Amino acid sequence: MSTLFTYDAPTMQQEESEEEPRTSIFAGALVTVSLIFINVVVYVVIALAGVSPISPAGQQLAPWGANFGPLTMHGQWWRLVTACFLHFGIIHLAFNMYILFQVGLYSERLFGEMRYLLLYLLAGVGGNIAGLYFHPDTVSAGASGAIFGLYGGLLAFLLMQRDAIPKEGAHALIKYALIFIVYNLVFGLTRPETDITAHIGGLLTGFLCGCVLSAPLSTDSLGHRSLHLGRILVVAVGGTALAIVAVEKLPKRDAHKDEWLRAVMVSPRLTVGQNDVLVYAGSATKSDAQKLAPALVKVGLLNKPGVLLVLTRDNNGAALLIPFKGDETAQATEAKLSAPGSSLSGLPLAHTTLPWEDPALLRSLAYVGPQLTAALGTTPLTLRLLNSKGEKHAEIRIDAVAAAPGRN
């Protein structure tokens, strides 16, 4: 992709300074170069830490600060920023940094360092919030939202400062920006792994911020520089406040589902038997998992390759989260727990019965529960039955001597 950033336009910083214009390609590009450097360093650090350098899974990036609804909306708001500096592999990073270098060099000269950095960060945050609205359960990362915001800011500048550069150069920039935006939006629609909503959110945020940051100020006003700094402060505070409100207005989420997703995504795990996994979260320890795992194998809860259970603990006791394939509309499940007294590896549930609605399954779990409590060495232990989405449908409370099955 060829660059159009060859015209040395007057900048908003030059309106405030009598410095001689610089001719180096990196002149006035301190922030752009710094952003690229930070992105590359982050990529190298996480790659050296074991994250796949080619195509990392979301589960690898989530612990490093990627945007993920169950974590971001659970108090880890900083992910709205850190996600802008993480990428899904070297190709993702290289493409974004190439585009950032092109649009960044010119945008930074137009807006100046402080306005440019503010525009970049707010656009990135705005894009990530948009992603949370539409794809809250998807791990997302990348500088694309912020970069789209720079294009939005560039268009806003050309709208608000129509005489800043010659019309020929302005028309070329508009054409270039629109081609980039349309092409990447259409391309993104053909790739399900692309978070197109974050791109659009960043674009709109960048345009709105750009309109405010590039609005002309009277050159004969007293305290001209103070007005510029005041405008930056207003946009920074206002943008942060709007981001907080936007996050607060996000749809309320199922607490049990988020507990499951958080545990699966970022908590440590213990591999058991034939590739079964026991995740331990909350205040549960590896020692807890090691004590419970043999009992889970013995009663048949961990006896099939690919099973994943979650052990969590808090002040109210321990809980074992048990997911079943299928949801409320399913006609069949993979559950194979049988009646009390058997090997718990035999009779499948009826095809028309969902696991959390099957009395025999609830009785079976209640029967084996005390064995799990004894192995774990704590009481109470709550068995929570989840669907494949992590939504709770039933739970059984196990104490030291009895089990009381129940639904909620």
Where are these regions (language model features)?
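A short amphipathic beta-strand at an alpha->beta junction
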Residues: 344-356, 370-406
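Short edge beta-strands and adjacent turn/loop segments
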Residues: 270, 301-323
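A short interface-forming secondary-structure element
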Residues: 322-337, 353-362
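A detector for small-residue-rich transmembrane helices and their helix-helix packing motifs
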Residues: 2-261
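Short amphipathic alpha-helix segments
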Residues: 289-299
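A mature extracytoplasmic/lumenal domain signature
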Residues: 311-313, 322-328, 387-389, 400-402
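Short secondary-structure junctions
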Residues: 297-305, 373-379
